[in-house]
Amino acid sequence: MKRIGLFLCGLGVLVAGASATAAADLVLADGGRTDYAVVSKPKPTDREFAAANDLRRTLKEITGADFGVDKRKTKHIYVGVKPACDKEPLKEGERRITSVGNDIYLYGEGRHGNDNVVYDFLRDLGCRWVNPSGDRTFPAKQPKLVVGELKRSTVPSIPYYTGNFNSSTEHLKDFNRRLGVYERGDLYVGVSGHAGQIVIPSGKIPFGGKVGNIKGPLKYFKDKAYFKTNPEFFALGAYGKRTTELQLCYSNPQLRDEYARNIEIVLKGENYNGERAFFSLLHDDHGGKFCYCKNCEALEKKYDHPAGAFYDFLFDMCRRFDRKYPNLTFICSAYRADQTLKPPPHQKELPRNMQFGYSPLGCDFSKPLTHPINAGWAKPLQDWAKISRRMRFSVYPTTYPRPVVSYPLTANIHRLVENLRFAYRNKARMIFCEFGSGPYNSFGFNDLRVYMIGELCRDIDRDEQAIVKEFMDACYGPASEMMQKYLAELEKIEAAYPKYLRWNPDILTMEHATAANLLRWERDFDRMESLVRGSARHLLNLRRARYNLDQMVIAKWPYMTKEEQAKFGGLENVIDRACGTLVADAKSVFAGTEDRPEWFKTRVEHKVAGARSGLDQYIARARGGKPLPRQFAKYKTVYRILPNRNKLGLDKDPEAPFGLCNTGRHPRRKSWLSLRTYVHGRKPAWESAIPPLPMGPRRFQKQPANGKYQYYRLGAMPIVPDAQLDFSAISPQSGFGVGHLYDPKRPNRLFDFHVCVAVDPDKKWVKLGELVVIPLDKDAAPGAKAGRTEKDTVDVFL
């Protein structure tokens, strides 16, 4: 953060309660009275109006004086008004605090400069809001508040903090404003994410709909069906036909003309007034080749890059709009190793109105980008920075294990700090935060991540541990010191994590979640809760931080011995506490809306259901399911694993072994599944370790597909530490995580796999009930790849 000038008073930048005043000092309040009124600019925005009210309320809380508008008052604190004597244009993101005579002016550049500067002023008084629940640090009461002559300019290190979140309640909006968070739509005009079929809709996805990762069209184009009227706008597939499953045909000049016309339609429809704003041109969220047509491939050769046609399209759009809209910047993402992760190698400089956002989704999520293991992911960001005026950085603040997504038992604070500082050194001046870094859930250390990001966006060099202490003192009160030690231990574990931690691992593969560690941490939380007894606010904050731990205990329960389980005080106690925390959290999030009982009830239920989508299957598994068929009784050790369906919950089905199932489409093909392993440093990182197993219609014809659950033996194979039995043919990113069963002391041990499936007689649906895995007392040949040991064997247990 750059600061030019200071509050000209002795103690720091503001003096509160001074016993004597200099001639140039401004006495804001004395003895509970003030001559000052806080005045907003004419026609303030909602955020500016709310910030001015915050300023009045906070000054009154500190001094006891009323800073409301009163015609008898002769002195003013103006919000959003630039004094006539200040002729210097504001830089991007700059905020200024200036005194002219007895008046004070707070003003800034950009959509939220005038409200952000209010919180610069309040922060210098010692005011911090640290989370959406209202926890804060405020100075002691000051009957006399004096400041010196003011002349200060602040340019935040990273002016724009935005992400995958919008506020649904007033107190969430309040927190966003106080921390300087931009709502998702604040910075963008019309389009903020993947834009291909949103701007050039195929007609296959209705307005408001979504298929996979592709959303339906903007409202301006909801009646368009370009795949019918202009199929040439879409990529040519590998087999010579146009398809909506790849990207747009970005080399097509008619497509470019239509795209440009549609951008103009959006700008007009959104009443774009020429202010600083961004428009996303990001391609659709499909991996692989963009287009197989000869013109696109010619541009790939020209740019020496697989995204050559797309880059050429981007640069064309920049040329078309540069002069007419000088403050409009086009955004795109450096995303996916086989697409835009790396810049075009011969490009010397990006257009002035082009900004790329770097998305390091494939890096090791237990280490920062500055760690040697992530060198291959750090270099593309550095290469983009060399040709860019500025960058956007996508923040993935935590791992996203399936199916719990944003709630893993991790710290991921220091890694976040290191990544932000590395991105800043490489010209990142905007950050886009993915799940787990927005003020919409408060479990684990999510709120700390949000606050840390906000503080570092203001001042990238601010001390990390000071921020942690400031946050924890406010949130956990007497338990702050113990919470800091808990965080430090998790940080130490992550720093020494032995495996490459991908972005979406199986939660059960996280090695630090041993029964001994889980028990010790649970007992630590018991002690912390005893320290805050009598403070409902501190207790709720502790329970939120404890939720990730409780969830992991439930997930690991079937893998503990009975002796270990007995030490936790009962499974149902852990389940009740975890589920109770979800409800208490949701009610806190939507507090203040109880006057709309149906809305409040629906929102609370929806939030709880979203969080429980991953938890419920671990609860079901921990409680135990229906008995297995008698054929399994002869085995001493049997592991039962429920399916996961990406980040979605499972379907309820009383006939399923655990009452839950993954319902998907019938694939109507020969092969349904394969064992996939994640291998760091290999392209592609995911590889199939065995040929697809023959579980298609040919096999099912031997047994009647009667819609009932049946157990099919797949065969025996060894596994590796990060492996998944993949059923993506049934539903995207679905299957069974099996890597947690790997034993490094016996790496070639064979496991027998049996899958429980119900198949619709009419071949419309398939239901996955569970996977049964049996460790065998024999090994595969040393060095052998994971694979079937018996040719084409699929047995059926009725």
What are these regions (language model features)?
Residues 20-96, 136-151:
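Acidic, contiguous N-terminal accessory segments
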Residues 427, 453-692, 703-704, 710-712:
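Catalytic domains of carbohydrate-active enzymes that cleave complex glycans
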Residues 733-798:
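Exposed low-complexity, polar/acidic, P/S/T/G-rich flexible segments that act as propeptides
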Residues 7-16:
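Bacterial N-terminal signal peptides
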Residues 686, 690-742:
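Extracellular carbohydrate recognition and processing domains
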Residues 34, 51-54, 58, 92-315, ...:
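Feature activates predominantly on carbohydrate-active enzymes
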Residues 334-361, 405-412, 440-449:
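Substrate-binding cleft/loops of secretory-pathway carbohydrate-active enzymes
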Residues 254-255, 265, 375-481, 485, ...:
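Structured mid-domain segments that build the active-site/substrate or prosthetic-cofactor binding neighborhood
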